[in-house]
Amino acid sequence: MMIKPPLSLSRITSAVAFPAMIMAWAVAGLHLPAADLQGCRDERSYAVFDALFLQRNNASISRPVVVSSTAPSAAVLGAADPVSTIGTGARATYGSYGEEDLGWEVGYLGVYGMHAARAVSDPAGTLQAADPVFAQQTGLIDGFGAWMTNDSQINSLEANFVMHEYDGGFNRRSGRPWQRVDWYDGGHIDWLAGFRWANLYDTATLAIPPGASTTPSTYAAQATSNLFAAQLGTRGRLAFERWAFEGWMKIGIAGTALSQSQSLVDALSQTPFRRPTSSDTAGMGMIADMNLSAIYRLDDVWGLRVGYNLIWLTGVALAADQWDFSPNPAGGTALQGTGSVFLNGANLGLEARW
């Protein structure tokens, strides 16, 4: 079965390139007075809080979920059709560079309220689940309307060792052109190595009211994915009198613990065709995290942040992938764990460095 890619390469490239161009313009064109800033210094501790506004791009297995009984080979509604709303969340990081530029940091990331829905209708009442025999056995048949919902949330914790390299700040003789700019205040590169845990909780429901019934027959699935990753990354920062620019990239190879459960409710029968089932398995996956941010420096400690993010989880179990439309009462126990989730969107927050 084909996997629908989360985003085209051109869209991903554009999403990163646009904020980068804005930052380049800001560096070249903005030279604001900053008499209250002390000049070149290498802060030793930092705390960051960002509000997140991220949209999930579904990468479910591309397959029919709802068809018409008059054309059962053509999808009326596909598993990957619903488009998610923008989820809100938070990211918090605290760290210290230590005495010898060998430090640590801890962080949390959470994204909530990612909701997707898609509804279809047919005045002839021919809508049914993808397999006609399964549809007859479960009451997912003869629908004038059908809808699918998908809800998910992500939580992540990480702890990293940090190796810090500071460039010394303004230097008229430096071979780096940005260090020769009069209003340059200092830059650094951090090398990160650590551990990251991420949890994806995903639910999906298919509903079809059979015939004239006002109560829908439903097929619900829940999937949980825990990723335990060894993580490497790098973070760079350039600070000027009033503006600073920061970007990072982190990637972790993860072992995964996956589980799923599902249940059917037949509006036409009190005896379920298939009892609730569940299963679990282990596998491998990946966590990738990228950010590009601009910071307006309020004073020597505080700054306002705005930026753009890309987050990618692979090797996860997606709820819609767990639906088993086979006409087998013992079905619904196989776990599909090859899904991926791609998030992109903005961050807005506050930082302190001292």
Regions found by a protein language model. Name each.
Residues 31-110:
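Short glycine/proline- and aromatic-enriched beta-strand/turn motifs that initiate or cap beta-hairpins
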Residues 96, 163-165, 236-238, 294-296, ...:
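Residue-level signature of outer-membrane beta-barrel architecture
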Residues 78-120, 156-158, 188-190, 196-199, ...:
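Glycine- and aromatic-enriched membrane insertion/assembly motifs of diderm outer-membrane
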Residues 60-85, 113-154, 200-226, 256-285, ...:
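Extracellular/periplasm-exposed beta-strand and loop segments of Gram-negative cell-envelope proteins
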Residues 53, 160-161, 340-354:
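Outer-membrane beta-barrel "beta-signal"
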Residues 43-45, 100-104, 155, 185-191, ...:
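Outer-envelope beta-barrel architecture signal
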Residues 47-49, 94, 104-106, 191-195, ...:
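Membrane-embedded beta-strand positions of outer-membrane beta-barrel proteins
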